[in-house]
């Protein structure tokens, strides 16, 4: 009897996991299709009905996940912040030092590069998005996470110079990804770059730059980085 009961419980758990996985897949598909339509015809010109039609689902099925376009845009930010929160939690569990700082920056680069489409959408629609209630609070939501990332990189009670370098590394990663991964016309890109970098090249360069900065920051925080006085 116990064996049969356990088998039923196991099947129920497996079914729930499968259902949750399907929900997550559908949500991700909605986000991807919404991004495609927003890029093709603009955020304001895109309706939920068009998103549902592109997906091949009813509006009711779409409403189960998102009640409005604003909800979809909010989900982009929530997902990004959720990944940052997980990264910060991971970093706080690691021993402080250059290796942890490098690994955290490496993981941060991954998050930013995988969020490229979302960043491009937010950049193209700044006026519209920033006018929403969520848009107004986006940076205030990012600031405490930036402070937490900086603390993981430098350690607690780091000197101001070290914290500024940490912030510079974080912003350099996100800004560089937004610029070098942008789908700008070739003529415009050729004016500033001999050849567009591949994602692998961009990732390697960013990691090298961030690693150099993080190594200096860790030494500076521990008092091991010399400072040449002004003359």
Regions found by a protein language model. Give the residues of each.
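Amphipathic alpha-helical packing segments from all-alpha helical-bundle domains
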Residues: 85, 130-167
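Short, basic, alpha-helical segments at the C-terminal edge of helix-turn-helix-like DNA-binding modules
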Residues: 78-85
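Hydrophobic alpha-helical connector segments
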Residues: 75, 89-118
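Metal-dependent phosphohydrolase cores
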Residues: 2-14, 88, 103, 112
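Amphipathic alpha-helical interaction segments
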Residues: 103-107, 121-124, 164-172, 205-208
């Amino acid at each position: 009897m116990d064996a049969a009961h356990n088998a039923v419980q196991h099947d129920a758990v497996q079914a729930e996991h499968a259902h949750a996985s399907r929900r997550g897949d559908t949500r991700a598909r909605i986000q991807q299709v919404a991004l495609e339509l927003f890029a093709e015809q603009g955020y304001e010109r895109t309706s939920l009905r068009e998103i549902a039609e592109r997906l091949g689902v009813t509006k009711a099925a779409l409403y189960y996940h998102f009640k409005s376009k604003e909800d979809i845009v909010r989900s982009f930010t929530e997902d990004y912040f959720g990944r940052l929160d997980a990264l910060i939690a991971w970093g706080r569990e690691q021993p402080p030092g250059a290796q942890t700082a490098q690994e955290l920056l490496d993981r941060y680069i991954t998050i930013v590069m995988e969020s490229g489409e979302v960043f491009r959408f937010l950049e193209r629609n700044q006026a519209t998005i920033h006018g929403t209630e969520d848009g107004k609070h986006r940076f205030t939501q990012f600031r405490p996470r930036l402070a937490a990332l900086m603390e993981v990189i430098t350690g607690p009670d780091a000197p101001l110079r070290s914290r500024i370098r940490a912030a510079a590394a974080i912003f350099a990663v996100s800004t560089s990804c937004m610029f070098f991964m942008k789908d700008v016309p070739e003529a415009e890109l050729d004016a500033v770059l001999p050849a567009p970098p591949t994602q692998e090249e961009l990732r390697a360069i960013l990691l090298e730059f961030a690693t150099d900065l993080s190594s200096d920051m860790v030494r500076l925080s521990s008092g091991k980085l010399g400072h040449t006085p002004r003359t």
